[in-house]
Amino acid sequence: MKSENVNKRDEYQRVFSCFDKSHQGKVSVSTIERCVDAIKSGKRAVVDQEDTTNPNPEESTDDKSLELEDFVKLVEEGEEADKEKDLKEAFKLYEESEGITPKSLKRMLSLLGESKSLKDCEVMISQFDINRDGIINFDEFRAMMQ
């Protein structure tokens, strides 16, 4: 796990360095916003030298730029939001109106080529059914997937 975190950290540093053309350890927020907008629209993002240069390098309270630690937090918050969205999409595949029931789990597993009996599905659900209502709600599903 630690190795994975080191690799992620190295990757974040590499991406940050691509934005930080002036090598001042800061990236302007407007540069990041332009790049994100370009990615969303399918265009190629252009990072100018001027975008990444702090006009006054002595000034350490520039709230219009991000240092590496801020950049990492921003990326990781985005990753968490993506994980939550992915979990919701996965949950929708299994759920009936009230949540994942043994019947809906059996149906989905069957579609995935993993046939289980209704009793097997009841046992699987009981392992993560925190409130013991026989149904997996989204919060229980999230806990199960972590």
From Swiss-Prot:
Induction entry: By touch and during darkness conditions.
Region listing for Disordered, in residue ranges: 44-65
Claim: Transferase is one of the keywords in the record: no
Pfam families (alphabetical): EF-hand_8
Gene3D superfamilies in the record: EF-hand
Residues in EF-hand domain copies: 7-42, 116-146
Coiled coil: none
InterPro entries associated with the record: EF-hand-dom_pair, EF_Hand_1_Ca_BS, EF_hand_dom, EF_hand_pair_protein_CML-like
Keywords, comma-separated and alphabetical: Calcium, Metal-binding, Repeat
Binding residues for Ca(2+): 129, 131, 133, 140
Alphabetized SMART domains for the sequence: EFh
Gene Ontology terms, MF aspect: calcium ion binding
PANTHER family attached to this UniProt entry: EF-HAND CALCIUM-BINDING DOMAIN CONTAINING PROTEIN (PTHR10891)
Functional summary from the UniProt entry: Potential calcium sensor.
Protein name: Probable calcium-binding protein CML40
Organism: Arabidopsis thaliana
Record lineage: Eukaryota, Viridiplantae, Streptophyta, Embryophyta, Tracheophyta
Gene: CML40
